């Protein structure tokens, strides 16, 4: 004869909050999080933070133009001056479009393609050995994650535009 074993209830995070702080406290926490996530100010901050690797790099290459040219030459990108100019334009204009939420799809697309191209051009871990290969591999995987984030920001921007 089989013994009946009751199924355990899986507690969601919100259920655990309710048990710990009482029902009303859980609702307050949930409402606070919803308010925060719906905040236009937080959205702008998130866009600025998301684009920081791009606008930070673009500004650094603009401020220290010769350093940017040297970086391009180091990675074998010739003519280094033109690659530096193209990088600055792509990084700063793509970031601006995303941060300002204007043609976000274009800014995210430009930065996504730019980021994808850096993998075979600069972070080609399959051609390297030892520690350099490991660093390039991890950089490449981080770049793939960034590309995913850029796709998400474009999707969310388009949804918001459609909803008005």
Predicted regions and their residues:
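Extended, low-polarity transmembrane helix blocks
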Residues: 2-63, 81-164
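Short juxtamembrane and helix-loop transition motifs at transmembrane-helix boundaries
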Residues: 65-78
